[in-house]
């Protein structure tokens, strides 16, 4: 019997492969545990259509992330913080503040977990480069200008 693997099976193959197996193994184990489906022409056609749809969605998502990367790379985000008597900042600029300012000033929503700041970063007035990990191995460099008020 021919089966279409839905999930990776250690001794048999990877998801998406069509394999010839014994009837009992195919029906009782693979199909029974949801690891495979009987490889009928309809099942194969549906699987290929679903794979094509996933690829198109992935391309669309990556193109949107590339656009966001380009937008973020052009922005210099200005964040004003209160200065102490000696001219240093009270505290530091946090990921949350960067994400909130991006949304407020530029209407761009970025998850605060995607923003990477070093421990000793953004604790003084100045211009900084901050990495924003967008997903699918795409990251952008955002310029953050910390100013005192």
Swiss-Prot record:
Q: Which InterPro entries has this protein been placed in?
A: Ribosomal_bL9, Ribosomal_bL9/RNase_H1_N, Ribosomal_bL9_bac/chp, Ribosomal_bL9_C, Ribosomal_bL9_C_sf, Ribosomal_bL9_N, Ribosomal_bL9_N_sf
Q: What stretch or stretches form a coiled coil here?
A: none
Record-linked Pfam families: Ribosomal_L9_C (PF03948), Ribosomal_L9_N (PF01281)
Keyword Ribosomal protein tagged: yes
Q: Which processes are annotated in GO (biological process)?
A: translation
Protein name as annotated: Large ribosomal subunit protein bL9
Annotated Gene Ontology MF terms? rRNA binding; structural constituent of ribosome
Q: Which UniProt keywords apply?
A: Ribonucleoprotein, Ribosomal protein, RNA-binding, rRNA-binding
Kindly give the PROSITE patterns that the UniProt entry links to this protein.
RIBOSOMAL_L9
Give the record's GO CC terms. Answer: ribonucleoprotein complex; ribosome
| Protein role | Binds to the 23S rRNA.
Protein family membership: Belongs to the bacterial ribosomal protein bL9 family.
């Amino acid at each position: 019997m021919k089966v279409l693997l839905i999930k990776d099976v250690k001794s048999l193959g990877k998801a998406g492969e069509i394999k010839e197996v014994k009837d009992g193994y195919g029906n009782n184990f693979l199909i029974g545990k949801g690891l495979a489906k009987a490889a009928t022409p309809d099942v194969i056609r549906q699987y290929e259509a679903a794979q094509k749809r996933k690829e198109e969605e992935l391309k669309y998502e990556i193109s949107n992330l590339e656009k966001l990367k380009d937008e973020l790379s052009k922005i210099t985000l200005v964040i004003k913080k209160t200065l102490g008597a000696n001219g240093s900042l009270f505290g530091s600029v946090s990921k949350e503040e960067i994400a909130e300012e991006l949304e407020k000033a530029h209407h761009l929503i970025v998850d605060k977990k995607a923003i990477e700041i070093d421990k000793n970063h953004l604790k003084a007035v100045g211009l900084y480069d901050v990495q924003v990990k967008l997903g699918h191995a795409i990251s952008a460099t955002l310029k953050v200008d910390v100013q005192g008020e």
